[in-house]
Every structure is written in C-alpha cells, then in structure tokens.
Amino acid sequence: TRQVVVIQRQIPPLMERMADSLEQFVSLDAPFSLDERTKRINQVRATLSDPKVTASEQVRQVLEAYNIEREYGRTIETYEDSIELDGEGKVVNILRIGRLALMYQLKDQSEAGIWNGSDWQEVDGFRIPVRDGIRMASKTAPLDLLAVPVQVKGGE
C-alpha cells in the first residue's frame, strides 16, 4: 500500500541520522575501545550506503550498534592500550566500569589515574583499588565493592 512505500522511503534517512547521532555520541564519550567502536560505525555506514542491503537489515545493524553502546554502561572490562601521559605514549592497563569510570594503571602498577572528561589525570592513593578492579574485570578475582575515583560533571 501507499503507507508502506512512504515508510520505506523514510527509513534510509532515519538510519543515517541515527548513525550520525551514534558517531557523535562516541566522539563525545570517554575514549575507551575507540578502534572497535569506530570500526562498528564504519561498518554501519558501509551497510547504509550499499543499495543491495535491505532496509530491514539496515535497521537491524543500526539497532545492534546502539545496543552494543548501551551495554557498555552495564559492564566492567579491562584491556591494554597506549595512552598519552605527560606528553609521551605509554602502554597501560585500562579499567572501564560501565560509563561511571575510565581508569588506567601503568604496567608496573606504580601509577593509576582517571579520564577526567578531557585528559588522563593521575590520582594518588588509588593504585590498589584500580589493580583490584583490573583483577575483577579479568575474572582473576571475585567481584566485590570497589572504591574508585569518579569524575562528576558540573559539581564542585
């Protein structure tokens, strides 16, 4: 019917806007798993620009990308990455606790810090909690309460 045709015409621009919103969200979010997240957005964009892909498959892939981003808010993970500290790249262990905290610890565990919204900032006194969080995230220690620094926006 005519309504089906109208809806089919509206889906591609909606999917493009949703992909744009997702890309903007990732660019403004904490810088975790950026390669993986950017690759996912690029795959969605490739799907949206491929005329052979059905509208239903486009919708499925966009919604799947949104669901993966949503899950980041509910999970704890650790991985190795290279970040810039004091003007030089250093390989560190990253600890992400949902979207609440993104922390790093030097490989020798001599320093730990947090992403403060714009840069990595060393935080004294949190080496052991960050180490414990990394162990929990890597499943080498049982989950437990963890005291970690949290960046609060708009607060004092």
Locations of regions flagged by a protein language model:
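Charged heptad-repeat coiled-coil "stalk" segments of single-pass membrane proteins
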Residues: 1-59, 63-70
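Charged, low-complexity, helix-prone segments enriched in Lys/Glu/Asp/Gln
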Residues: 37, 69-72, 76, 127-138
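Long mid-to-C-terminal scaffolding/interaction modules that assemble large complexes
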Residues: 87-156
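Soluble extracytoplasmic domains of inner/organellar membrane proteins
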Residues: 43-100, 107
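General N-terminal targeting signals
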Residues: 23, 61, 65, 76-79, ...
